[in-house]
Structures are given as C-alpha cells and as structure tokens.
C-alpha cells in the first residue's frame, strides 16, 4: 500500500492506494500530524510499504512528520522537491525553488491531463492561478487570499462579525444580496473568488483563444465550479503531479 500526503498550510490531505492501483482505498483530511497517525492507525489491515508527500510547511515541521510516519509504520518517505523542468513543464519563476510545491505539482498534473495549454486554478487557504502553454512553458501565475483567509480576516478585524461554520454553509445556498452579516460576508467572499476566476479566464483567452483546458482543484473549488462550466474539477490534481515527481515503481 502507498500513502500519499499533501501537507498544506491548514490541513493534511491523505489517501492510501493499493499497490498497482491508482484509486484510493481510503482517504481523508486532518488538521494535525497526530490526527493523521490516528486516522491511519484506525484503518483495518493497513500495511504501508511506501509513502510520498508534498509539503508547503517549514522544513522542521515536515521532518517531524516524516519521522513520525517512520516510527509509526516503518515506512520510508519520499518528498517532492522543486525542479526547473519536469515532465515537459518548465518552471516559470525567476527562482524556481520559490514556487510553491503544491502549485508545481498541480501544474504537472494539469499539463499531463490536458496534453496542451491549461489554466490551473487551486482554491485552498490561498487561491492560485497558473498558466501553462502548449509547449510546457509556465507563463507565471497569481496568488490571492482564499475563502478561509478572507473569512478569517473579517472575523478577526471586525468585532461584530461572528458566526459558525454551519451558518456559513447555509448562507451559501444562494448568492443574492445578504440580509444578515453571515450572508453578506460569505456571499461577498464567494463573489470575489468568482471574479478572480473570470479574470484568469479572460487572460487565458487572450493567450490561447479557446484552445486550452481549465482545471479546478482545492477544497473550495466547488464554490466556483458552476461559474466555469467548461472546467474540469479534479480534486486530486496535486496527487497526479506527486506521482510524477516521486515515482515509486
């Protein structure tokens, strides 16, 4: 069995693949290393043989997780690393090592699936957009606050904005002007994300006309999916790239 991990700023996304299979036999999202170990330990008949991960966390944090996995399951961990070029994609950053690994792997996965020009939109703690031309050249990208950051900034810096996650979910049942604070905040932030998406689509069309593929990924991609009907929703796009960056066969 192969354990795959995407260690983001706020969550750890994990999945277990049966050897020789590309489909997950178990998967989940947790907030801490301890919760990850507990979730995995609770799986029946778990026999991990290999592990690969991508992390945007500090090296010390990542190293502690690698050690914990080895101690708990006796597994060696392969970690994705920055590259100037891989699988036909050329990193467009002036300093290629400064490009977030999650973005890099999503681009690798997107280019593999598209087999041509693509726009990769990822909605996590931050919202990111990356443009990959048909020849594999990464033209650059954009980063802006994602839904969690926008929501938390308003909650933190505005005294009267207080509500729970259940209220937030109910508020997003429609996008008409809000008649409560929670509706106004949640719908306003969602519309900002959609505006970000539409701007990226306009720029992509200026590059490639209609000859490109749009990929949506990340935990909040469902907030914008109906605004981009031509897009492909690929929740595990980073894992597609991770398998390319850390082949285990």
UniProtKB/Swiss-Prot annotation:
It comes from the Bacteria. GO terms for biological process: coenzyme A biosynthetic process. K(+) binds at residue 122. The keyword Nuclease does not apply. Its cofactor is NH4(+); K(+). A monovalent cation. Ammonium or potassium. Pathway: Cofactor biosynthesis; coenzyme A biosynthesis; CoA from (R)-pantothenate: step 1/5. Its main location: cytoplasm. Substrate binds at residues 93, 100-103, 181. InterPro entries: ATPase_NBD (IPR043129), Type_III_PanK (IPR004619). CDD domains: ASKHA_NBD_PanK-III (cd24015). It is found in: Cytoplasm. It is an enzyme of class 2 (transferase). Its EC number is 2.7.1.33. Belongs to the type III pantothenate kinase family. Homodimer. Catalyzes the phosphorylation of pantothenate (Pan), the first step in CoA biosynthesis. This is Type III pantothenate kinase. It comes from Pseudomonas fluorescens (strain SBW25).
